[in-house]
Amino acid sequence: MPDIGLRLGGEVLVIDGAMGTMLQRHDIPAGQSLMQLNVTAPELVEEVHRLYALAGADCATTNSFGGSRHKLDAYGLGEQVVDLNRAAVRLARAGGAAHILADMGPTGLVMEPLGTATFDEVFEQFAEQASALAAEQPDALFIETMTDIAEARCAVLAARSVTDLPVFVTVTFGLNGRMDLSGTGPEAAAVILEAAGAAAVGMNCGLGPEQMLPLVERMALATTLPIIVQPNAGMPRLQDGVTVFPGTADEMGTYAARFVDAGASLVGSCCGSTPSFTGAIVDFAKTRPLAERREPEPGVVVAGPRGVVRVGGGAPLVRVGERINPTGKKRLAESLRAGRLDVVREYAIEQADAGADLLDVNVGAAGVDQQSVLPAAVLALSGLVDQPLVLDTTDPVALEAALRVYPGRALINSVSGESASMEAVLPLARRYGAAVVLLALDDDGIPATAGARVDVVRKVRDEAWSHGLTDRDLVADTLVLAAATQADGAGA
């Protein structure tokens, strides 16, 4: 069977359906983790996989949704995290599907700024699970049912830190078209997760196929990555005190065809579905030609948890608010030295209300520990304003700390043609999926002529390319000089 990466762009791949719906038909004791069945009743799990494969599923999703240590600790199973996850992959493979997607669900921890869990705590949870799953060589890791873009992004970064396997990720939207915890829409989710290194993005759970269709259409316009769609079997409702899903297999199949026409290439089903739903998806959509995907608009796209901004490529002028900079601002500098962020928040709200599209964040001042204050400011602002952030520091340690925790795609301000700057900044931009401003300044200072400054930008661009960045990651700042200060070179 061809590598899953080779199949993604050429055909519709059908993903299986709900695991829990099928397992809960058996007499499973209340309060037991379904993952425990991977070792206590493996035949039940394997049989579910086999039924979905017989229905035509190309991809089996492992029974490891609740497989983080934190989730397993709730059942006293934390020390079995490796064994339970590895068993999940083996059982999925035994079921006979062509491809194995190693499933990873939310950790159950709520990350800063919405909760108290730190980035590093959640990162370690995902890295441990991803490492265990990857040891059994599935075709891809599959992060799913994410309601907070910060956790989804953290999961992708953690997975990529321990394996070279492709990482698929789906998020869950509410009826308002936004992720429940972070308020992220489909466009921002696609931009942020693609930048983090996802190989395919999409949505699952939360909604039925009818409600999901317009969100698929929107997401498909925001990325060129393969789109994954796995709706519930209709919108859930309570019936005699029991949650039921009213959708039918034929309805799912009909919408599966529409999902493909909207740009999806991996289609499955979620809560309430059974192998009959998978069979309907196969019947209605498996042989359907993939839609012609439109290229995203040109320019560099950055995103915060709740907003997307395009820079250049014919986009309207972007206004960058630069008041969050302690230079010449005694009140701001004093608050930062004291470890307070009230003035940062105040300036951010003022600039957002005044129409800024992006907010530059600079906390560099004597006596300020940038390595702790910059990430703290980034977290505070990401939960406060919709505008994407521009991270403005010459301290590479502070920059990395801020890039790690920012639940979006930041713009780095900036990298110059100085050797030390390129060596420090460009690997960070690549690792964390950030865009970066290229500054027309090198080890010899600011060139006197416009042509020489453009040459410096080209040099930095070439170095950025060598680090795996593309023109869609790069913004040029050619440092236009006033004729009054540089009369000889202003027009050269």
Task: Name these PLM-found stretches.
Residues 1-492:
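Domain-level signal for soluble alpha/beta catalytic cores
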